[in-house]
């Protein structure tokens, strides 16, 4: 499931109803954050739905019960990414305004709890500072999918010409210029 909000809402139902392994993006992101965090102070940014679900909190606490968690919903980030402005002065301003409550906290790790947010990695990292490691839940999930496929003998190591299908919730024209 390539969406944090959808993972939080339906992962267990999908696992129960499908005969195949179903990966969500929350558990891999949480595991990576625990692995890299030295202070066990971890921040989570995501959509309102993801943050409200507390799915990351549950995942982190199930791995390390003494982790300290700070969560922040960032409702302006998805429209910012979908507008194509992710590396502009506007993006830097919105990132700074939005993440101000997390700045200068004791966290050393920040989970990007939305698959749109990796496009904002640069302004987020610059604002939060070099002492904060930024974790992309999508990247971590791709790593886990690769391991699962390899373990099952299903990982394709050949490089045939791939076929891509893209879906977007935003402007098709904007997406086409990006993709």
Language-model features, listed with the residues they occupy:
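Non-catalytic structural scaffold of enzyme domains
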Residues: 1-179
């Amino acid at each position: 499931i390539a969406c944090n909000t959808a993972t939080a809402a339906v992962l267990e139902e999908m696992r129960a109803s499908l005969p195949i392994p179903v990966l969500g993006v929350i558990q891999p992101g949480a595991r990576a954050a625990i692995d890299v965090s030295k202070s066990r102070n971890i921040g989570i940014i995501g959509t309102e739905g993801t943050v409200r679900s507390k799915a990351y909190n549950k995942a982190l606490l199930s791995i390390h019960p003494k982790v300290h968690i700070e969560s922040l919903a960032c409702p302006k980030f998805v429209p910012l990414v979908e507008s194509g402005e992710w590396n502009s002065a506007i993006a830097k301003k919105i990132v700074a305004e939005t993440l101000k409550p997390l700045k200068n906290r004791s966290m050393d790790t920040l989970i990007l709890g939305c698959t749109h947010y990796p496009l904002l990695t640069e302004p987020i990292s610059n604002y939060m500072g070099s002492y904060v490691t930024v974790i992309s839940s999508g990247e971590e999930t791709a790593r886990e999918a690769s391991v699962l496929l390899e373990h099952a003998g299903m990982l394709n190591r050949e490089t045939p010409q791939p076929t891509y299908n893209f879906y977007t919730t935003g402007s098709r024209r904007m997406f086409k210029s990006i993709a």
